[in-house]
């Protein structure tokens, strides 16, 4: 039996919702699983991945087998990975969710969605990417004492997204190391008040709130110095008509949000604008990904 899992890319934090908010977008990693006589892991698109038991898809699948007291059989795993790695688009969460869903289906769907989310969060360490990867939409999550509390809302389909992906990686560890150990009380209030507006802005048609809802003082000011050209990308995206611009996850991708009615004009302007920025401030090139929100989440066939 061959099992195929598709998992969407995710964009965490959404500006103000540091380590709490995330949303899924229409870019998908796919993984197929088949039982075999030996472990065989390959990449269908040439992406360099570990081909042994250190592979995150395999480790996640094994984690589920271990949790239910079963021995994982030898597997043939084939990955297709269009989600760029170490760019703030949830590539590791996609691997974790793929491994868990593949293993869960092999075992007859022994874990429910909440149990899968909890196990995924224990592997990843935080729920802001794994929740939207599994559930789709915009998720608000808390991880407390090993329990995940998560709420999913469908994102307004009149919005479109532009993931502006630079040609350099930013590892999450480095991005987290840049954060201060303490923050000012007023900065916490600044973010809390804006994060409270995010669901209305993204899910209830309040596009007038998109810009203010995604403003941040907790992480972006500290991470953007590690992202050459990001300040200019923010400015360019706004000039081209973006309603909101924020650092996706830990970076290095910048996510811009626009109204779908203006999508073609927005994307065309942005593409030309990014060409003007290439070679500036240590970034040689940008890839522009035209995306929508994914309200379905991961799927298994």
Protein language model regions, located:
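ATP-binding N-lobe of GHMP and related small-molecule kinases
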Residues: 1-87, 101, 109-111, 293-296, ...
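FAD-binding core of FAD-dependent oxidoreductases
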Residues: 11-13, 17-24, 86-96, 124-139
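Solvent-exposed alpha-helices and their adjacent loops that cap or buttress functional pockets
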Residues: 13, 22-25, 69-71, 123-124, ...
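DPxDG-like acidic metal-binding loop motif
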Residues: 27, 89-113, 134-136, 144
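Short beta-strand-to-loop capping motifs
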Residues: 35, 166, 256-260
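Alpha/beta catalytic cores of group-transfer enzymes, especially the acyltransferase/condensing modules
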Residues: 113-159, 245
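Active-site rim beta-loop-alpha module in soluble metabolic enzymes
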Residues: 163-225
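Glycine-rich, charge-dense phosphate/pyrophosphate-binding loop(s)
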Residues: 202-301
């Amino acid at each position: 039996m061959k099992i195929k899992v598709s998992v969407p890319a995710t964009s965490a934090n959404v500006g103000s919702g540091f380590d709490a908010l995330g949303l899924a977008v229409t870019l998908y990693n796919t993984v197929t699983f088949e039982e075999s006589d030996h472990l065989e892991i390959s990449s269908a698109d040439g992406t360099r991945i570990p081909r042994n038991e250190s592979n995150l898809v395999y480790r996640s699948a094994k984690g589920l087998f271990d949790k239910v007291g079963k021995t994982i059989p030898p597997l043939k795993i084939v990955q297709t990975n269009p989600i760029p790695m170490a760019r703030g688009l949830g590539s590791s969460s996609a691997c974790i969710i793929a491994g868990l869903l593949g293993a869960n289906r092999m075992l007859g769907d022994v874990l429910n969605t909440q149990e899968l989310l909890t196990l995924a969060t224990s592997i990843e360490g935080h729920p802001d990417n794994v929740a939207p990867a599994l559930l789709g939409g915009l998720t608000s999550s808390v991880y407390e004492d090993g329990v995940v509390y998560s709420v999913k809302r469908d994102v307004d389909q009149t919005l479109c997204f532009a993931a502006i992906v630079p040609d350099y990686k930013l590892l999450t560890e480095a991005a987290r190391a840049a954060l201060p150990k303490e923050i000012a009380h007023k900065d916490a209030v600044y973010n809390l008040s804006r994060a409270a507006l995010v669901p209305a802005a993204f899910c209830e048609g309040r596009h007038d709130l998109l810009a203010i809802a995604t403003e941040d003082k907790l992480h972006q000011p500290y991470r953007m110095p590690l992202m050459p050209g990001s300040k200019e990308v923010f400015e360019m995206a706004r000039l081209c008509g973006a309603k909101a611009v924020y650092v996706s996850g830990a970076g290095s991708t910048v996510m811009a949000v626009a109204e779908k009615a203006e999508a073609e004009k927005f994307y065309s302007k942005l593409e030309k604008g990014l060409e003007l920025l290439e070679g500036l401030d240590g970034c040689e090139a940008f890839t522009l990904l035209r995306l929508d929100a994914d309200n379905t989440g991961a799927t298994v066939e």
